Amino acid sequence: LHPRVRRQRQMCIRDRYRWTLWRLQPALGICKRTSRGACTDGRQMNIYKLDNIKLSPTSDERELVKIAARALGHKPLYFRILKKSLDARKKQDIHWVFSIEYGDEFPPVCAPLEKLRSHRKVYVVGSGPAGLLCAVRLADRGFTPIVVERGERVDDRAESVQKFFGGGELDENSNVQFGEGGAGTFSDGKLNTQTHSGFNAEVYRTFVRFGAPEDTLYLNKPHIGSDVLKNVVKNMREYIISCGGQVRFGTLFSGFASRGGKLFAVRLKTLDNGFETEEAADDLVIATGHSARDTFAMLTESGIAAEAREFAVGVRIEHAQDCINRAQYGNVKGLPAADYKAVSTVSDRRVFTFCMCPVSYTHLTLPTNSRV
């Protein structure tokens, strides 16, 4: 070991729970710091973090454990990848960049959320990502949410969509935009976002909890994949039901009733037979996405305030994948399909690339027969 590394490791041995700043650039080309937490018995513990670890495209990720072991002096009991991204700025030095966390003890585990055991009837309209995540959190807290979805279960919905792509008729209530899983079900389950929110990590953890790949937690541009996403969505639905909730498909939210400004009922329409019922409700969450125009019209006509949201108008640009790979990677092989990001300002307005879909298809997506 580099003498500086050896000395600083000895400092930790002498005072295991000391707040220490490590600098390992001379030895490993990386920076390291510790974060301190508390064990359940009140002892202090150190969890170490290594940033800016560079590995070649052909390296095995198990090399990261060896790097942690060298810094710690022995194989760590706890190890986790925090972040993984590809640095292709220099064609002669393309490499993966990692951040890892490790230690001799596992970090403290957050206590489960308290079960409130509420008897309030909560309706969630829509089973896209917003609706499902909302219902899962409600179930976690002891509620028994009722999810209302006009479309079909994800497997039945996939069949309807494939029939439409093959020239069949459009089902206006179950298509690329309506149905279990939301519109993202057929766009490879990409989870990259330009919104910097503290809730992003919790969303990723929830997806992994229900079956998404573990690398969703640390990839720079994570995506679940449409096939895996279908199972994740089904697992969420089964969990909601196991907690006493309901998920009703083929059911349209057609209205609500209030008294003195307070909600007391929702009106639901069964699409198979057109039968409409009114059910008592204490709370209502609208998670319909952006395509349920009839729902938005009903809400505004009922006096619910609404305001237009800014949106971007986009065009599709197609490139040969080999051209993008050569531009980004040069002649380096064995890397994932390359993408890029471009931003400019035209007449004081931003123009930017947003969604990269290597080896993708363009399909007409329309919620009704009269509108694209």
Residue locations for each model-derived region?
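Tryptophan (W) side chains
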Residues: 19-22
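Residues forming the flavin
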Residues: 46-186, 190-210, 214-364, 370-371
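Single conserved hydrophobic/aromatic residue that forms the stacking wall/gate
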Residues: 1-15, 363-372
